[in-house]
Amino acid sequence: MHFVKMHGLGNDFVLVNAMTEKVPGDLPGLARRVCHRRFGIGADGLILVLPSEQARLRMRIFNPDGSEPEMCGNGIRCFARYVYETGLAEGEELQVETLAGIIKPRLILEGGRVAGVRVDMGAPHLEREQIPMAGTGSPVLDEPIEVNGETWRGTCVSMGNPHCVFFVEDVTGAPVTTVGPVVEHHPLFPRRTNVEFIQVLNREELRMRVWERGAGETMACGTGACAAAVAGALTGRSNRKVTVHLAAGDLQIEWSPVDNHVYMTGPAVEVFRGDFPLD
């Protein structure tokens, strides 16, 4: 099975053209094999390129544990670059079908080469049942959540997938690996949740660490950065246009007051290509 390894700010993926490659029927099992960092290729996710009846192409993504999230911000930037450079799609603007709906990435070209990708992530969902999250009252702003005997205050947003955002004084020392998995599986979140730990540097800059649903702590999360920007604006901590600093670089996030959509701009990088044995 031919593949391309790519990353968006260290959030890495194995991309496969499932329209031409023979892909096993057990996709969760394939993802677990491929994403394993010792016995496979190693990645935060497996991305499949598929035909679509609703858009130009369809993207499916599977986490290292075999679960299938609705969307992935860093993943769709890699997807957009991959399909453009392999000739599967033409033009700078794409429409991609995902479980979160139609997502619209736009390639940023410099000298004919892809320098980055700007993605229209659509409008954030703030209603509790759309996140989804148990309880009553929307939007969910700084709501107390009991974790390991402590009370954390979370602001919850869906960017097509669920996010719980915690604002902290110092993200470097945040208990991502202990609080993150507990919140991911908290009874409040029937579909589990991604968990962001955010330090507000100023009204235009956020620093982020993330515990991703089904993947653990990763170097970056595009939908998480979008959720963090929305949460910051909703709670008055930051502006609607911010730079989100992650371990390997930055994402530019803008929550437009014009159309209520969130726009994410960042890199997508090819690492290597290869063939993975399926036998």
From Swiss-Prot:
Pathway given in the UniProt record = Amino-acid biosynthesis; L-lysine biosynthesis via DAP pathway; DL-2,6-diaminopimelate from LL-2,6-diaminopimelate: step 1/1
Residues of the active site are: 72 (proton donor), 221 (proton acceptor)
Positions bound to substrate: 11, 63, 73-74, 161, 194, 212-213, 222-223
What biological-process GO terms show up in the record? lysine biosynthetic process via diaminopimelate
Its subcellular locations are: Cytoplasm
EC category name: isomerase
Where in the chain is the site Could be important to modulate the pK values of the two catalytic cysteine residues? 163, 212
Recorded catalytic activity of this chain's protein: (2S,6S)-2,6-diaminopimelate = meso-2,6-diaminopimelate
Query: One GO CC term of this entry?
Result: cytosol
Return the EC number. Answer: 5.1.1.7
* PROSITE patterns named in the record: DAP_EPIMERASE
> What Gene Ontology molecular-function terms does this entry list?
diaminopimelate epimerase activity
S-S bridge residues: none
- Keyword line: Amino-acid biosynthesis, Cytoplasm, Isomerase, Lysine biosynthesis
Q: What does this protein do?
A: Catalyzes the stereoinversion of LL-2,6-diaminopimelate (L,L-DAP) to meso-diaminopimelate (meso-DAP), a precursor of L-lysine and an essential component of the bacterial peptidoglycan.
Instruction: Say which family it is in.
Output: Belongs to the diaminopimelate epimerase family.
Record's subunit section: Homodimer.
Q: This protein is called what?
A: Diaminopimelate epimerase
Source organism:
Moorella thermoacetica (strain ATCC 39073 / JCM 9320)
